[in-house]
């Protein structure tokens, strides 16, 4: 399986990285490492995470208040949001 981030999700990841780097040097890279680990968990076990709605799933990010919101299309994982879990729930639904 491969994984693809939609443009808005990639921008959210970049924004989160920059915010954490501004807080403490190196913290943004720790976020990226946790996202990388989550992406590998998703690719290994794509259906292991809780379902949101009918077809989407959410994989929580360790140590950070984020979740990867994703769908499965044939052999590709589509990440539609790198969602901050304490802000605007379900803001990403128009991307579906």
Regions from the language model: what does each represent?
Residues 2-56, 73-76, 95-96:
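Basic, Lys/Arg-enriched alpha-helical interface segments
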Residues 29, 67, 71-96:
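Enriched for short, Lys/Arg-rich terminal
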Residues 63:
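Short His-centered aromatic/hydrophobic patch
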Residues 10, 36, 66, 85-86:
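Alpha-helix N-cap/helix-start and coil->helix boundary motif
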């Amino acid at each position: 399986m491969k994984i693809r981030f939609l443009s808005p999700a990639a921008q959210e990841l970049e924004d989160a990285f920059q915010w954490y780097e501004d807080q403490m040097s190196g913290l943004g890279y720790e976020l990226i490492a946790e996202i990388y680990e989550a992406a590998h968990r998703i690719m290994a076990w794509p259906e292991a995470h809780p379902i949101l709605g009918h077809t989407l799933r959410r994989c929580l990010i360790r140590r950070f208040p984020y979740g990867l919101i994703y769908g499965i299309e044939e052999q590709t994982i589509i990440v539609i949001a790198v969602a901050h879990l304490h802000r605007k729930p379900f803001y990403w639904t128009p991307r579906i």
